[in-house]
Amino acid sequence: MLSDWTSIELATRLRTMNRILDCIVPDPPTEAVDDAIEIVLKAVGRQEMTQAVTILEEVVNTNPFWLRGYLLLATIYQYVQYADQAIVTIEKGLAICASGLRLFSAPKWIEAVERINGPVVHNRIRNHAERLRRYERMFRHRLAMLQVRCGNLDEAIEQWSAIEEVHGA
């Protein structure tokens, strides 16, 4: 009975997370990703966590820049008491954010963008960089909370410091 309640709670949390992320950091709509999320939610509802994890891992491995997938996957790992795997997943998402942000701040990239004479292009690039920064903050926050739960207080403080540093910049 308790496991039924937990799977319903997890499915509700994943669905709610997905809706909130649609508002905060909307992804371009793709039928394949929407279908994958629906299949994952149904699998969680049936308590088939292995299937849900496998599907999310496949989608993230196919498209490593689908940052939402890392958050959803880490949430499932956290609910099935695999905190270490949740941490690894969040760290992977954080690494993807960092590589994207490095790309946007590279001198050659900035020079190339400055030569483009179009406000629409500049706007899209700024929006994408802001989207990466939002995900980075979410990943760092989530990682800090997971580190606290695991008793890794030094690592948690490191993440909180990085969050403060980003907000101060």
Stretches with model-predicted labels:
Residues N18-D35, I125-E136:
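TPR-adjacent "capping" and linker segments in tetratricopeptide-repeat scaffold/adaptor proteins
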